[in-house]
């Protein structure tokens, strides 16, 4: 999306819903186009029987947004999606500056310049493009990376900002539909969650020193209670000092901001949201998430809390009262619900092991809820890439949707065709034929092997009484019958 290369040889092929085929690979090293501009990518577009050669992928053939959600603690997606693009663009800009210095006689000529043959005009155009990409990373990031830690920022956005324009002619209908889907999301967990408020603890010094990114400007304006010339309603701001000391010995300042949810009647149903945040973020919950994530990663937000009531019960609950599985369910499926057409017509979701922390009952409903939450109007251009080891999730996937990645030697990953269709297949068959795994644990398997060698019918019968139903119990019973028959023949 930034015309950057991953650092290895690759070929990328995909097809759009309208039939357009896109083929991408790296250009030859040092390649320049007719204008003298150095190019990194070779792109072919095949549409209506015609092929067009380009040097970048047009925006209309890229996702409006990429949302990456990784469950593991050892994920490198943050480096790949957030830090690496910025570092790569900075490196390109540095290389261009060296080439310009050499051209102007201000730098040494090494004979190994990165941009040989590139004209000064082309270098200037390249520099402007790099700066525009760099600015877009800050101003309107198209990639959001979330994990178990940052899941806490999803719940406030899910209830504060609804993904549509409040001036829409069909606002009541859309709000009711959205509220119904949110309720369905919660009902699956048997929770009657009614949002009360969310709050932020802000490090004033970090906020003052933070780079002047749009997200930081948004946060500063929110905390100043001056949003588009109006005071921020349903928000309590309290500034205080902490026990921490600044470098000059003064007490560090902190700001606590509490955002109170409101309910709005839509055809007799209560729809909870935050009116001012809804207007300020123009119906884009992802703009709110981006602001919160940026401030969190820069150390500006020290804490975030979310308070709710559970039905008619007295008292408030905190986000920490949810189990890991409950929070992960609301976060992973909630992201899909928020990605409605108002926020972009197509979003690419990269989900790594999305069933982590789920019990089997929730995993069984994961794919069903992906389809149910994807679009409120029945149309969606969203795509999902899901990495999983769950045989239960695979029972909801068609054979054409699955790619099996194997790394038998530990050095080269291979993509293989599935031997069976997993859709509605038995989990034992999937576990054995797809993952090459046994249907029982290793300890149980060793125990069964020992029992199959048992020659005392009484000992074997006693052991069988402790074995659960299934094929292994059947094997042991067959072995017991064989021993009893053998003993009868000996006695006879």
Each predicted region: which residue ranges?
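Switch/communication elements of ASCE P-loop NTPase nucleotide-binding domains
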Residues: 1-9, 283-288, 294-445
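Conserved beta-strand segments of the P-loop GTPase G domain that flank and frequently precede/overlap
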Residues: 69-70, 352
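Long, contiguous juxta-domain segments that are non-catalytic but functionally important
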Residues: 35-49, 276-280, 288-292
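Conserved P-loop NTP-binding catalytic core
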Residues: 1-36, 48
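A Trp-anchored, charged/polar loop motif used as the substrate-binding/catalytic surface
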Residues: 38-53, 326-338
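Extended helical coiled-coil dimerization/tether regions that scaffold
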Residues: 108-115, 121-124, 128-134, 152-154, ...
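Acidic, Mg2+-coordinating catalytic modules of nucleic-acid enzymes
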Residues: 50-53, 57-67, 73-192, 196-210, ...
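A structural detector for beta-sheet-dominated domains
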Residues: 13-15, 25-27, 44-46, 147, ...
